[in-house]
């Protein structure tokens, strides 16, 4: 009991002091073709950032959307998100791989994916009118306290997640909404952390599936049992928040990372671009994106004493086997027995 109370106290302290876990999707891969996503840590500071398939967002710190904003448009595609100016073309039945950075993803929780038909160009659609239907959702896989989660599968595949576009989806322009919900602090009100990411895709095919959807601001409520929950208990029964997966669709597909073999730029309505073949490709590494490259990745020197973790990365906790030292000026702060984080 004393240990559980201690867990709750440190979790509350983490929430009160604004401790966050950070990440965004750096790129997506469709049938071996690499597309750049929106980078909130660099694009806002560029005079002419590239047109990409990912929606822009004002999460300059790789931060999250909290439950008190669930009825705010920020929950739809992240903070102050605006439409991506381009899209990627996919066929119904294709798989799309998301690459999260930085690695490893530090927090336990579910992973969910949604689609919303734009009924026109997604580049100009009003996000508050989008009606999302869930095409997959994976939560607690086994155990408890905290157990094995969808996020652990993502970590084991180098921070990647694969989603399948339904085989029988009606053709059209869609916003694909991918999301991790971090639950390490969810035992306290407003403690869950949502990381929604949106992408424009143009789906081709001959299917007829057109599920009804839910407005983004109606997907979740702060008191949903899958949002307000202490995961540091066992046994644990977890209910993934939001609408159920569309009837007849699998809750997930086989997961695994793979190297891209070509690159492509986002297609702009009225224009076009295509894959650029590459003669050399590299497999994913734990600190690099999935983009093909013919040159070795840049390296940076680390303080003496072995590898270090980046700011806001995990540096300790039960079952953790990565770096336990933080790159200066950050220090490793223990939040609970299961998680320690590099903080300033």
Swiss-Prot record:
Location of the region described as Disordered in the Swiss-Prot/TrEMBL record: 262-310
Comp. bias regions, Low complexity: 275-310
Effect listed in the UniProt record for changing residue 105 to A/F/W: Leads to lower C4 oxidation and higher C1-oxidation
GO molecular function, one term: cellulose binding
CBM1 domain location: 307-343
Keywords tagged on the record: Carbohydrate metabolism, Cellulose degradation, Copper, Disulfide bond, Glycoprotein, Metal-binding, Monooxygenase, Oxidoreductase, Polysaccharide degradation, Secreted, Signal
GO CC annotation: extracellular region
Main subcellular location: secreted
Protein's UniProt name: AA9 family lytic polysaccharide monooxygenase cel61A
Source species of the chain: Hypocrea jecorina (strain QM6a)
Top-level taxonomy: Eukaryota, Fungi, Dikarya, Ascomycota, Pezizomycotina
Gene: LPMO9A
């Amino acid at each position: 009991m004393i240990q559980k109370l201690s867990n709750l106290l440190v979790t509350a302290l983490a929430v009160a002091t604004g401790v966050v876990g950070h990440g965004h999707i750096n790129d997506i891969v469709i049938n071996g073709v690499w597309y750049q996503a929106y980078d909130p840590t660099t694009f806002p500071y560029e005079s002419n950032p590239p047109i990409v398939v990912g929606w822009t967002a004002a999460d300059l710190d790789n931060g999250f959307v909290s439950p008190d904003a669930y009825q705010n448009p920020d929950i739809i595609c992240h903070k102050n998100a605006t439409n991506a100016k381009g899209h990627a073309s996919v066929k119904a039945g294709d798989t799309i791989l998301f690459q999260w950075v930085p690695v490893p993803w530090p927090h336990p929780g579910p992973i969910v994916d949604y689609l919303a038909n734009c009924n026109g160009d997604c580049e100009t659609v009003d996000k508050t009118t989008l009606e999302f239907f869930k095409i997959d959702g994976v939560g607690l896989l086994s155990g408890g306290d905290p157990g094995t989660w969808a996020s652990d599968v993502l970590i084991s595949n180098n921070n990647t997640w694969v989603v399948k576009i339904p085989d029988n989806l009606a053709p059209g322009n869609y916003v694909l909404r991918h999301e991790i919900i971090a639950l390490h602090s969810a035992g306290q009100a407003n403690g869950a952390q949502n990381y929604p990411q949106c992408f424009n895709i143009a789906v081709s095919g001959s299917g007829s599936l057109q599920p009804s959807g839910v407005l983004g601001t109606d997907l979740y409520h702060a008191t949903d049992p899958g949002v307000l929950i202490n995961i540091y208990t066992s046994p644990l029964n977890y209910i993934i928040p939001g609408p159920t997966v569309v009837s007849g669709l699998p809750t997930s597909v086989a997961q695994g990372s793979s190297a891209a073999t070509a690159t492509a730029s986002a297609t702009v309505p009225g224009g076009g671009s295509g894959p650029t073949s590459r003669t050399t490709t590299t497999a994913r590494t734990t600190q690099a994106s999935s983009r093909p490259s013919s040159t070795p990745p840049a390296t940076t020197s680390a303080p003496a004493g072995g590898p270090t973790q980046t700011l806001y990365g995990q540096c300790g906790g039960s079952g953790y086997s990565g770096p336990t030292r933080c790159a200066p000026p950050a220090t490793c702060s223990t939040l609970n027995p299961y998680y320690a984080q590099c903080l300033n």
